[in-house]
Amino acid sequence: MIERVKTTKLSEASGLPKTYDPVGTENRWQKAWEEKGAFKPDPSAPGDPFSVVIPPPNVTGSLHMGHAFNTALIDTVVRYKRLKGNNVLCLPGTDHASIAVQTILERQLKEEGKNRRDLGRASFLEKAWEWKEKSGGRIVDQLKRLGYSVDWSRERFTLDEGLSKAVSEAFVRLHEKGLIYRGEYLVNWCPASGSAVSDLEVEMKEVDGHLWHFRYPLVTSSVSSAKQISYLEVATTRPETMLGDVAVAVNPSDERYKDLIGEKLTLPLVGRTIPIIGDPHVDKDFGTGCVKVTPAHDPNDFEIGQRHDLPQITVMTKKGTMNHNAGQFEGLDRFEAREAVIDSLKEIGLLTKIEAYKHSVPFSDRGKVPVEPLLSTQWFVKMDPLSSSCSEFFEKGQPKFIPNRWSKVYRDWLTDIRDWCISRQLWWGHRIPAWFVISQTDNKVVNETPYIVARTEDEAKKLAREKYGDSVKIEQDEDVLDTWFSSGLWPFSTLGWPDETHPDFQRWYPTNTLVTGFDIIFFWVARMTMMAGVFTERMPFADVYIHGLVRDEQNRKMSKSAGNGIDPLLLIERYGTDALRFALVREVAGAGQDIRLDFDRKNQTSATVEASRNFANKLWNATRFALINLEDQDYENLESYDSSKLQLSDRWILSRLARVNHETANRYENYALGEAAKGLYEFAWNDFCDWYLELIKRRLNNSENLSSDELLDRKIAKSVLYKVLSDLLIMLHPLMPHLTEELWHGLTGLDEDQFLALQPWPKSNEQDLNLDLESSFSDLFASIRLIRNLRAVAGLKPSQKVPVMLVSGKEVLQKTLTTSINDIAVLTKAKEVQILSPEQAKSLPSMKALAGVSGELEVVLPIEGLIDIASLRSRLEKDLNKAQKEIESLSGRLANKNFVDKAPKDVVEECRANLTESEAQVRLVKERLMGLD
């Protein structure tokens, strides 16, 4: 650490090129940070621990704008905490993405006319690891381009040795607690990938389909005869599943059918007799009020079947073809079978109606085909005990969601949960640590425990031999675990768990902040809290910052399918990483809000990011200006001067600096990152660059004929310049790390390995705060803007110097104006500046002048004899006439009730705003015309 004071070495302005090269600068500092281990923390180092484990991107992935947004938010928080003196660990890693990788590899094999079983498991996994090593580093390299201040030496991969050990340990412990079981249940089955898929891997798509109505004949009975009913009619979007129907359900309160409950129907095409059952979950007002029940192929039907102890008849194979239970339709693809069933029902006169029907169909995100609810023997985690534990923590406020509205979503998920299917019929992933007992020689029947769960194969063999004898043989389950199982352990497995004595676990667990999108609260955030609750008895993070989506300029969600995604690397190459990061964070209106990012596809440009690049250029040029004026180092630390010697402009900028310091730190602390970016932008661009640098230019002159007071004033100006710029760069560092690192080194002249990223946050001197002075300077700047505006109205040439009168009855403002009279004259090209009280202004002789008012200040610009008054009057009268016509037009539209009631709300509001603006314009022009009389 170094103290931020004037150093013995200072770069000349030539140390910074005239133009800013963002890509070159960023590459250089990213390399320096990593080579010097700038972000590699020591667990024993001082400072309160602060840790973040980044959401692991898929190893198959490539950088998209969501990654860039997430990175910008996380790294802003992390870099700020480092500046505040915390012992920070930001740990990176990637996810093995089992389905995604396996899909890619199987596609490659298919092109070669092979499949994974042709290779065998060992060869297939060898090929998968080769692919991962070759292609999997792309996303990491791209993340590095974003300037992530993570410890790359601690980078983890969900299939690496340590995490694999943690996964096996977690599985064994959950099984020992009775929280993992093996059972038959309906799962989302993807026929294309040949595996169960999680709910997250299912995408609901609106499909134009049909609703087919057909009849089930009643088996004749006294009840049916009395009611003169010979059939029940049902409707379905999936007629092929009727081959597995085991009942038809009606609502027991439905007067039409309640007397038929317990009667029998004949299942068409199959001939099976099935019962009519009563179930209160049937909506008697939907359709015919009769629902076909297929427990083996529909989740709702499965629940009905469980309640009524109905059989489960599966009519499809895992490849999506019809099986032997489908009778004459065996071997047909499920969609071919659909058409065949419809034709057969039509042929026997039981098809009654076909209607167009738009409905949601679940598709496999990876396989891109409709998933099939299929009965399958899988491994499950009992979720109720886990969610109950999390609910107890939640009642204590753990974790805290930012914004708070997402806590309700999290709580609702905890209270509406079903057991989690964790097995996948894949080879790439964490193989389930369970071994089936397949044979023994002592003729004892092995039925009480058909499998052994263990951490390793050796442990499994030992347990099996102890239970079944030395000759027992075991074979490991072929399936792998759902990727979300290992992801659920991410916050603590990456820190050394299950070894809770590991220095990283001891120092940085629980972690502090998780930054993620709202779309995986269900699937990742909640599973992490559940896993942490059961294994560490603590929540894995204190805060969960939920960010929104990146949308395009038309407010559409960015996605590949919509064709409106933007490649972050393209914008990085054009504008720089810092410009992109700053633009993304600055667009955040509030925590959790979506942001918009424009993009001109023809020119490959973004006005939003370009504005941030322009801001970077502004800072670059301001620092070059500072270096030119600070290179002689004839100034001291600001604290060494008598504060009474500071000019009002110095006190004003130091007051603004103190306030911005306090506000920025508070905003960073409370995740108001967008507000932090906006506040720093306004301070840097307006207060520092546009005003303070202009105000001190005349004080920085290098004349040798200066008095001792002038020399002291010059030194003070330089000291304030150094202080403000240095502190500004540090406060901006979390948002624009590369640029600020470069400029700060140029300013301080320190060695390259003394990083700004590791410096302390600047101290804020509350004694510098002076809100009255800030208010007066706001009025001062308003007067300068008004004078410039009046000069433009008068059509004065830039070289023309005219007198200016400033009228105010506010004593503090008068003092500020009087002290700054020379600055006003220079910045407005005034011949002379008079500061008058209202009483003094009244005693002035009548004159032709332009005037304007801003707050408690009136500006008068005498113009008689300087311009052609008649020409100006004519121009103003034209402006007045134009504004009055605009008022007439707008008033007419707003008086039209039909327009106000039927036009879009934003159009009406815009019309009202334009009317208000035009009315103000009329008043202003009239005032200016009066000044010419």
UniProtKB/Swiss-Prot annotation:
The keyword Glycosyltransferase is annotated on this UniProt entry: no
Coiled coil, from the record: 866-932
Binding site for ATP: K560
Residue spans crossing the bilayer: none
Region (Disordered): 1-24
Compartment list: Cytoplasm
InterPro entries the record matches: aa-tRNA-synth_I_CS (IPR001412), aa-tRNA-synth_Ia (IPR002300), Anticodon_Ia_Val (IPR033705), M/V/L/I-tRNA-synth_anticd-bd (IPR013155), Rossmann-like_a/b/a_fold (IPR014729), tRNA-bd_arm (IPR010978), tRNAsynth_Ia_anticodon-bd (IPR009080), Val-tRNA_synth_C_sf (IPR037118)
One annotated Gene Ontology cellular component of this protein: cytosol
Matching Pfam families: Anticodon_1, tRNA-synt_1, Val_tRNA-synt_C
Keywords (A to Z) from UniProt: Aminoacyl-tRNA synthetase, ATP-binding, Coiled coil, Cytoplasm, Ligase, Nucleotide-binding, Protein biosynthesis
GO molecular function terms attached to this record: aminoacyl-tRNA deacylase activity; ATP binding; valine-tRNA ligase activity
Motif 'HIGH' region location, chain numbering: 57-67
Motif ('KMSKS' region): 557-561
EC numbers for this chain: 6.1.1.9
Enzymatic reactions: tRNA(Val) + L-valine + ATP = L-valyl-tRNA(Val) + AMP + diphosphate
Any GO BP: valyl-tRNA aminoacylation
Keyword Oxidoreductase appears in the UniProt entry: no
Domain notes: ValRS has two distinct active sites: one for aminoacylation and one for editing. The misactivated threonine is translocated from the active site to the editing site.
Family membership: Belongs to the class-I aminoacyl-tRNA synthetase family. ValS type 1 subfamily.
UniProt xrefs under HAMAP family: Val_tRNA_synth_type1
Assembly, per entry: Monomer.
Task of the protein: Catalyzes the attachment of valine to tRNA(Val). As ValRS can inadvertently accommodate and process structurally similar amino acids such as threonine, to avoid such errors, it has a 'posttransfer' editing activity that hydrolyzes mischarged Thr-tRNA(Val) in a tRNA-dependent manner.
Protein name: Valine--tRNA ligase
Organism of provenance: Prochlorococcus marinus (strain NATL2A)
Lineage: Bacteria, Bacillati, Cyanobacteriota, Cyanophyceae, Synechococcales
